[in-house]
UniProtKB/Swiss-Prot annotation:
Sequence segments annotated as region (Middle domain): 364-531
Protein name: Interferon-induced GTP-binding protein Mx1
Chain segments carrying region G2 motif: 100-102
Record remark on domains: The C-terminal GTPase effector domain (GED) is involved in oligomerization and viral target recognition.
Region (G5 motif): 277-280
Record region (Critical for lipid-binding): 551-554
Amino acid sequence: MVNSKGKITDSDPGSSHLLLNGLADKAGKNQDTEPENSLCSQYEEKVRPCIDLIDSLRALGVEQDLALPAIAVIGDQSSGKSSVLEALSGVALPRGSGIVTRCPLVLKLKKLLNKDEWRGKVSYQDFEMEISDPSEVEVEINKAQNAIAGEGQGISHELISLEVSSPHVPDLTLIDLPGITRVAVGNQPADIGHQTKKLIKKYILKQETINLVVVPCNVDIATTEALSMAEEVDPDGDRTIGILTKPDLVDRGTESKVVDVAQNLVCHLKKGYMIVKCRGQQDIQDQVTLTEALQKERDFFEDHPHFRVLLEEGRATVPCLADRLTSELITHICKTLPLLENQIKENYEKITEELQKYGSDVPEEEHEKMFFLIEKINAFNHDITSLTEGEEFVGEDECRLFTKIRNEFHKWSLVIEKRFQRGYKAICKQIERFENRYRGRELPGFVNYKTFEIIIKQQIKELEEPAVYMLHTITDMVQAAFTDISEANFAEFFNLYRTTKSKIEDIKFELEKEAEKSIRLHFQMEQIVYCQDQVYQCALQRVREESDKGKDRKINSMCSKEVSSVNISLSDIFEHLLAYRQEATNRISSHIPLIIQYFILQVYGQKLQKDMLLLLHDKDTHNWLLKERSDTSDKRKLLKERLARLAQARRRLAKFPG
């Protein structure tokens, strides 16, 4: 309703007509006087723009992206739903047995504030037709339903738009939905009941939709399927209005029960109930006009001993219903506009970001295609450079490729340390075994170099396969990263992506072999036991100092028994092994990662970039390389259409006086 300050509220469903149609009617009757002109201006400024805004957004197709404020009309078959819509719109809609409304019908009613002639328009799919006579509406709606849903009793989710402009209709937009059916009859699909409920729920589930539930007065309201569906999606009744029809068919003695329902005392809805008496089948056969039917309706409620009170409360007659619905729709639109604006903004930003992934359209001109391909390849090469230099952009929960590789190198250093430190006691036994086998004429206390050399070579040799395994692991990581970059840049061009992926694999196999060859060569060189004299002497001195100070108790504790039973030279050999191991560890732990970085990052990236630039030389392949996936161009087109819709919607919302 509208309170004393002119604000629309939900508390009293009956008194809202004082602002809306009453406002418009007064403005239309006395357009020459200043007060009425003021009312007309208020009507034009407050009511019309709200509904026109939402209708324009719906016409743009914004409803494909997000929900718009709407009033959806639902009801069981034979509930009187069509009669209510006819009374509101002033035009005859399809009638008959079975499912009459087979497609959602957007009924846009526009009140003309002057004496302009009645006009209508039917729109669906790519078809649009102006209508000059109200009697043509029913035929055109039937044609539209047959074109969309086919001949027969099938239904469709596709919208039909009917626009009616007249001095005798309220400013209102309704969505008429198929009547609820339970059993398939005739040539209806076997699951017609499921189909209709699914279609209805698609609309009434949305929080932006006011559900207008049409219920006959002569049925038990508690068992009504339409009201049950509304309660399921709106359990608190916040956005549901009940419309009671056929009060003239109520059995004698049950009128008070109908009044209780209408006064919201039985099945409570926060927005309450309205009651109307529309044309019945006999009225139609008697050719009672809609205007005459409205007068008969008012006379019925004024003269009825039980229902008169509902008229006095503003809960009865079609004109009161029209005003109430317009009031509700305006309130609902104003309430949801801020949220709608935010949703449009968020969707616009999201689609813009998604569209960037698909890039721009491929040019038609050959020379432009060359520049387009150059840009694509340069962008790819730039990403490869960033990756190999450890400067690529990564998400919040991701890490750079170089970080992953560095972790593998750290694991490598731990492997070396673990292999060299493996079992001091076992090494002591190994020293003893080699000493017994290879000791020559040396006197006790002299180190046998052959023993030292064989042991150190064996320890280093054991690291060769782990090094090669690390190479393969890192190569696979780099290949996967390069492939991801290729997909990110070329996914929509399947030939270019496939060509790039093939090059990534070919270069990988080539350089992996070279890197493995270099690693194995390094380990072959490590079989030459060598270290600069000064470096080795310093390392040996450090080992002996640690041994003397008792810091390296492992030598003394683990080998004391072995030394006492064999020869003092075992301790000396162990010290030499530790000294040489330190220097060998430094060499191997650094040089193997250098080999991998050189071949698998630096050379791999450079060679791939050069091979990609070579693609530009063969102009005959440009069209083939830039051939898009059909779904890519379709998706880009769809995203652009959505973006254009939302951009227009944002502009219209920005201009709305609000």
